[in-house]
């Protein structure tokens, strides 16, 4: 790691140099869900409904992977900033081993529970069967996902963003190529339907992990993974989980939110469940540029905090917030202008498209204020203040939106649920500023 690069380069160019490879890779990586949804929608609306209902559990698995990865990233960046290379290597090794363990547990738990979980939201046996088929294959790759994410966060912590971009792009391109072949049986491949979508995604994730391993063997890094670093270290493991657990909960809360909103919307029509599922696919794509900025910002804040550069930490936060606000403004404009075509990518049902246009335009009103909570939460994670970051997410994904959505849905119907989104973002933005400013003064 270049010390002058992290501590002396002007903040805006520094953030962009760290974040742009992540923005590109995450935008392309978001195509995993977009491409799956696009091709699955061509099977049937029942298949699309199944994919929408599986999404919260899929998001939960990703939340564990990314959330614990945030802990790995923050601890490594801090120790490198403090010039403690051996501690950084221990954190990387323990983080990777624990990530693999998390993957094994999630595979064993999630696959058997899927038929029961899907039955909570629909009594359509075809939807339950399709969802179970997809989950059974997709969730079998949980260990691969966990280990890949640990390597991703390790590379980000040491400033190797281009290597991360290469690995993610390789996996995503593999998924895009294989999806139609495995779903529809093109060329030598059998027609697998929704199972083909899951298998294509899994193979893409394996390709990403293989690229990470090859890079690790060929590129010199300021830390190493090894058996000698696996010796028990409860203090360091506690640090990993102290940041990783709140970060995981931050990312898992949307899964609980989606399930709760699905239950509210299903009372009106299954079309609204499909619309919510489509929105979250699109939201992933629209929010990912901001997420890429946050990914680039976290190690910078952690490194400079570890080096005692507190004024530079404040500057990094301010620039990140401004960049996120610009991205969110662009997302709002896209949803207002192209709401119809965006919905039509995933369904040809005129009623669903019409209802979805209204939903997208209403929900997108909250994009710009959401920049405050996104930037504040990411900065707090980079500073190692995972609990404070979780407080922001708790407001955003549970304490405000659920009661507001429940009340408004009783008054205005399903449209009330859409209005709950922007109301929540305004309230959470105010809470985020208070929590962040109070935390950095401590």
Placement of each model-derived feature along the sequence:
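Residue-level hotspots within the lipid-embedded alpha helices of multi-pass solute transporters
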Residues: 26-30, 63, 103, 107, ...
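Small-residue-rich hydrophobic transmembrane alpha-helices
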Residues: 48-108, 112, 145-159, 163-164, ...
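Transmembrane helical elements of multi-pass membrane transporters/channels
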Residues: 17-36, 137, 171, 204-208, ...
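N-terminal transmembrane alpha-helices
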Residues: 6-38, 42-43, 59-71, 75, ...
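Short runs within selected transmembrane alpha-helices of multi-pass transporters and secretion channels
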Residues: 69, 73, 138-156, 164-172, ...
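Short alpha-helical transmembrane segments in multi-pass integral membrane proteins
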Residues: 1-19, 76-143, 189-245, 301-366, ...
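Helix-terminus/linker motif at the lipid-water interface of multi-pass membrane proteins
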Residues: 27, 31-49, 118-125, 181-192, ...
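Hydrophobic transmembrane alpha-helices of multi-pass small-molecule transporters
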Residues: 60-63, 107, 175-180, 209-213, ...
């Amino acid at each position: 790691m270049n010390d002058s690069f992290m501590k002396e380069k002007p903040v805006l160019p520094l953030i962009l140099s760290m974040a742009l490879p992540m923005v590109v890779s995450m935008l392309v990586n978001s195509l995993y869900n977009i491409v799956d949804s696009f091709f699955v929608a061509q099977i049937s609306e029942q298949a699309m409904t199944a994919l929408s209902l599986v999404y919260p559990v899929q998001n939960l698995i990703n939340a564990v992977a990314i959330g614990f990865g945030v802990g790995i990233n923050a601890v490594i960046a801090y120790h490198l900033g403090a010039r403690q290379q051996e501690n950084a290597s221990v954190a990387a090794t323990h983080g990777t081993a624990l990530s693999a363990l998390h993957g094994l547990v999630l595979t064993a738990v999630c696959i058997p529970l899927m038929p029961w979980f899907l039955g909570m939201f629909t009594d359509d046996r075809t939807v339950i069967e399709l969802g179970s088929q997809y989950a059974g294959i997709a969730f079998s790759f949980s260990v691969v996902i966990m280990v890949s994410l640990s390597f991703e966060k390790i590379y980000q912590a040491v400033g190797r963003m281009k290597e991360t971009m290469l690995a993610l792009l390789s996996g995503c391109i593999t998924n895009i190529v294989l999806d139609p072949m495995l779903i529809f049986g093109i060329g030598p491949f059998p027609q697998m339907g929704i199972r083909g979508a899951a298998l294509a995604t899994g193979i893409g994730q394996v390709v990403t992990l293989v690229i990470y391993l090859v890079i690790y063997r060929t590129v010199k890094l300021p830390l190493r993974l090894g058996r000698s670093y696996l010796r028990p270290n409860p203090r360091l493991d506690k640090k990993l989980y102290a940041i990783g657990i709140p970060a995981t909960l931050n990312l898992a809360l949307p899964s609980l939110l989606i399930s709760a909103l699905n239950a509210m919307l299903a009372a009106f029509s299954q079309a609204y469940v499909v619309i919510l599922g489509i929105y979250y696919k699109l939201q992933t794509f629209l929010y990912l540029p901001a997420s890429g900025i946050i990914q680039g910002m976290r190690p910078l804040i952690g490194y400079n905090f570890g080096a005692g550069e507190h004024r530079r930490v404040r500057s990094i936060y301010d620039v990140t917030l401004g960049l996120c606000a610009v991205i969110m403004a662009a997302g709002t404009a896209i949803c207002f202008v192209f709401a119809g075509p965006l919905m039509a990518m995933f369904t040809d049902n005129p009623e669903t498209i019409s209802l979805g246009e209204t939903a997208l335009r209403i929900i997108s009103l909250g994009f710009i204020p959401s920049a405050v909570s996104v930037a504040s939460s990411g900065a707090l994670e980079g500073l190692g203040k995972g609990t404070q970051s979780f407080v922001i997410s708790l407001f955003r994904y549970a304490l405000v939106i659920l009661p507001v959505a429940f009340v408004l849905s009783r008054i205005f119907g399903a449209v009330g649920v859409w209005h709950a989104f922007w109301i929540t973002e305004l309230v959470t933005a105010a809470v985020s500023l208070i929590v962040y400013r109070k935390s950095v003064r401590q």
